[in-house]
């Protein structure tokens, strides 16, 4: 970074727009390949229904598992070298891996590359850390809520675009198109994101114990990590059974896939609408109130999902659930900002990402196990119980310690 750039004030609003675009592109890139992942596994030589299901589950989950392992390392490096560098590393690394995925010749190569994708990821948590350290604290809720809509938008559009591209050009070319999107993200970040960061030597870096002692409220921060994990468990538990549940509700109709896709997408649309607004409200009344209210509202929506009789009823409830979900993670992230310093923001957001990834792995496993033993409807009731526990646990953690007063 040039000296003149160091002297120029950073326009955090511009950085927010560019980071939003980066999260959108990476969200779209990740979800582009999701619709045909089992088909690509089959193309790589896996045959048989049970083997195909097993390998599809493994190659899907391994990315999140390795992301959970690698996130703390990248977070520490971000606190030493800067968050922009980590954004560039992530976008370029994932782009190269996507090219190699399109060239994979067998399932083992593909599995290793999916693990490598998880190891080299981390664009979103580093974007969160970058914006969190630049935005005025009293606007954190709105900024992080707005930023979260970037990844959600990309994840919504990605599957549709991926399906169309796969039908038009075949499976392998989609990986190369995805790589191009990630390379575009790299250049957008390189030329448009600005950061004032003074590199820190390894000796000056805070060790884990010092990170914990530097937190304003270590127990609260840990409880927020657990809250993130449970939010993802609750979200992921429904994913494996949603299409089958819709088919059970719809009966003999020809467009079950379309109806399922619509019902799967509506929470994301609702989150897009609610996240910035509820984030802004959280800046006024406190993110802790938004978090607890959204968790309780989620419980009240999950329970009737177990008793719906039509796909329309399920779709309406999932739309409302998406509106609540849009507030949850931004509220958690805002509370993390309030309870940590800029010096350790990279690690705090990366630890939070690790818990999120663990939830992404365990949620679908929990949902599949419950539905196999007790039926589809039981999944919603158990998930409601998990979220209710989360609400009580979060309320108890927040009640014990007063949230620090936020100033400009």
Curated annotation (Swiss-Prot):
Gene3D superfamilies named among the record's database cross-references: MFS general substrate transporter like domains
Subcellular location: Cell inner membrane
Bridged cysteine pairs (disulfide): none
Membrane-topology annotation of the record: Multi-pass membrane protein
Domain of life: Bacteria
One GO CC annotation: plasma membrane
GO biological process: one example: xenobiotic detoxification by transmembrane export across the plasma membrane
Similarity section: Belongs to the major facilitator superfamily. DHA1 family. MdtG (TC 2.A.1.2.20) subfamily.
Function: Confers resistance to fosfomycin and deoxycholate.
Protein name: Multidrug resistance protein MdtG
Native source organism of the sequence: Escherichia coli (strain K12)
């Amino acid at each position: 970074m040039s000296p003149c750039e160091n002297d120029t004030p950073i326009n955090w609003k511009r950085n927010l727009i560019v980071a939003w675009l980066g999260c959108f592109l990476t969200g779209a890139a990740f979800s582009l390949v999701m619709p045909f992942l089992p088909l690509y596994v089959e193309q790589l030589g896996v045959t048989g229904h049970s083997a195909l299901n097993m390998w599809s589950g493994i190659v899907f989950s391994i990315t999140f598992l390795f992301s959970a392992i690698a996130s703390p390392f990248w977070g520490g490096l971000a606190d030493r070298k800067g968050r922009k560098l980590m954004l560039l590393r992530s976008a370029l690394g994932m782009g190269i891996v996507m090219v190699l995925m399109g060239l994979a010749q067998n399932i083992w190569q593909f599995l290793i590359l999916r693990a490598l994708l998880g190891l080299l990821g981390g664009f979103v948590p580093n974007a969160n850390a970058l914006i969190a350290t630049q935005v005025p604290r009293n606007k954190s809720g709105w900024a992080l809520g707005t930023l979260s809509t970037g990844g959600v938008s990309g994840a919504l559009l990605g599957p549709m675009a991926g399906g169309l591209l796969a039908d038009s050009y075949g499976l392998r070319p989609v990986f190369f198109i995805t790589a191009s999107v990630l390379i575009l993200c790299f250049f957008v970040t390189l030329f448009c994101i600005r950061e004032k960061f003074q590199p820190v030597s390894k000796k000056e870096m805070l060790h884990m114990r010092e990170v914990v002692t530097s937190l304003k409220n270590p127990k609260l921060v840990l409880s927020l990590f657990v809250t993130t994990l449970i939010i993802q468990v609750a979200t992921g538990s429904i994913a494996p059974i949603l299409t089958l549940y819709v088919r059970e509700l719809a009966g003999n109709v020809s467009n079950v896939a379309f109806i399922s896709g619509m019902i799967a997408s509506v929470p994301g649309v609702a989150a897009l609408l609610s996240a910035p607004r509820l984030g802004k409200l959280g800046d006024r009344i406190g993110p802790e109130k938004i978090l607890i209210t959204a968790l309780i509202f989620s419980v009240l929506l999950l329970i009737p999902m177990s008793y719906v009789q039509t796909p329309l009823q399920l779709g309406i409830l999932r739309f409302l659930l998406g509106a609540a979900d849009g507030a949850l993670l931004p509220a958690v992230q805002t509370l993390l900002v309030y309870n940590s310093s800029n010096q350790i923001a990279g690690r705090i957001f990366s630890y939070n990402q690790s818990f999120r990834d663990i939830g992404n792995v365990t949620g679908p496993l929990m949902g599949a196990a419950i539905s196999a033993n007790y039926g589809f409807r039981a999944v919603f009731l158990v998930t409601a119980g998990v979220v209710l526990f989360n609400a009580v646990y979060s309320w108890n953690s927040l009640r014990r310690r007063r949230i620090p007063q936020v100033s400009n």
